[in-house]
Amino acid sequence: PLIRDKEVIQEQPDQRSIAERYTEDAVNFIRHNSENPFFLYLAHMQVHLPLYAAEKFVNESENGDYGACVASIDWSTSVIFDELKELGIDENTIVIFASDNGSRLQNQGGSNGDLRGRKGQTWEGGQRVPCIIRWPGKIEQGSESDGITTTMDFLPSITKLIEGKLPSNKIDGIEMSNLFFSNETISKRDLFIYYNEDDLEAIRYKNWKLHLKKEGEEIKELYDLKNDIGEK
């Protein structure tokens, strides 16, 4: 079902139209809140399985349904950016693109490039994802950072940038806004621990990553990610 807040608004929506409906709601939210600080979290269903895309994108795609779903996200992004510019708040809005995991198998449309593994695994192909942050006039266009971070760090980092106040209860994120600016590469995170459900599968310290277990079987594999990002 399609749910808004706690209300079911449609039991069996046409999933090919979901991107357009999400985008319409996002634009309406921005319009109604443009004169005040706002937070918008937009998590498209594309390109998650099963793949559904509007017919107009399928007809234009050179990479099947997967390419059509990517095109629908591109379209949605352009609509939202146009709205921010139309309202005059484009340069006062931080936009973050990120993913919660790596791609599936390549024969399902996605690709993790040289990274080993896929979604659901603790190899870099399942864990390392791009993050693009846009803030016109504040974050230099084309700047890059390979400092290690996680989506848990967004809350304290953005809170600092907007001069907000964090909740008093303990949070897991670390303030990482230094990585947003001027090709900064120094991360405040030295240690990463990788679990697959209840199994501790890998530990990373700085550039070194030790794999301990995969699919219930113990292994001992150590990689220098600075020189071997593909864990070969």
Segments the model singles out, each with a brief description of its role:
Residues 33-40, 89-95, 128-129, 187-189, ...:
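Loop/turn elements at helix/coil->beta-strand transitions in domains of secreted/extracellular proteins
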Residues 50-52, 59-65, 69, 82-138, ...:
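Histidine-centered active-site microenvironments of extracellular/periplasmic hydrolases
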Residues 37-43, 70-73, 77, 94-99, ...:
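Beta-strand elements within well-structured catalytic alpha/beta cores of enzymes
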Residues 103-113, 117-124, 138-143, 147, ...:
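C-terminal cap/loop subdomain of S1 sulfatases and analogous C-terminal strand-loop tails that border
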Residues 13-21, 64-71, 145-149, 170:
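Soluble non-cytosolic domains of exported or imported proteins
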Residues 40-50, 97-103, 172, 194-198:
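Short, solvent-exposed turn/loop segments enriched in Gly/Ser/Thr/Pro and often Arg
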Residues 1-12, 105, 191, 212:
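Catalytic-site neighborhoods of secreted/periplasmic enzymes
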Residues 6-8, 24-69, 104, 112-113, ...:
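Active-site His/acidic residue clusters
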